[in-house]
Amino acid sequence: TIDIKKFYDHCTREPVYHFFVQKLKTSPDVAEILTNIITYDGSIPTGCPTSQIMAFYAYFDMFSEVYDIAQKCGCKFTLYVDDMTFSSKEPFSPHQLRQMVDRVLRKYGHRPKYPKVKYYGPSDYKPITGTIVTPRQSLAVPNGLQKTIYNAFQSVKPFIDAESHSEEDVKQILSLKGQIQAARNIEEGKFPEIRRLIN
């Protein structure tokens, strides 16, 4: 796995503008207006509804080059915003792949977050974008999320059966339901008893 360091901060307005002009074939004046709407202080802001999709399309050529590198190394490339994962059933050189990806990222004004560059072997549990991939290639809920759900349940347990709930109680219960749903999106039958008790 390779994370891109301060990805949104380095997603500048120029690639956004070029996306509108070159890919969507808008006129330069329309591209300028759209770029002004989507960027803030010269970059794509973190947390806006448009940010993820715009960053992907503005840097589509960069991600295409990374994809080509993955193919050459015999890897499958998956991407979630700035989290890049390279997986293969066959051994490959993570050092060589990292160097080639580093060159491409730097060409586009980005660079890897080196402390977050990790290599996992076939027998390792691999944390990838909010899930764990087990050595048997199945998905598992991360321990951190399981602990969060358990702790949240301990907080709401005293007032689950109350006839009425405060606004704060309702928020806590709804938050717990959302966390359980996130876990069940990874492992379908996870937390059946807690789910039954809070429904």
Regions found by a protein language model. Give the residues of each.
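Hydrophobic/aromatic-lined pockets within catalytic cores
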Residues: V21-K25, Q71, T85
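Right-hand nucleic-acid polymerase module
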Residues: I2-D29, I33-C48, Y57-S64, F92-N199
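Short secondary-structure junctions
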Residues: I69-G74, K107-R111
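Catalytic palm active-site di-aspartate
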Residues: T1-K5, G47, S51, K72-K89
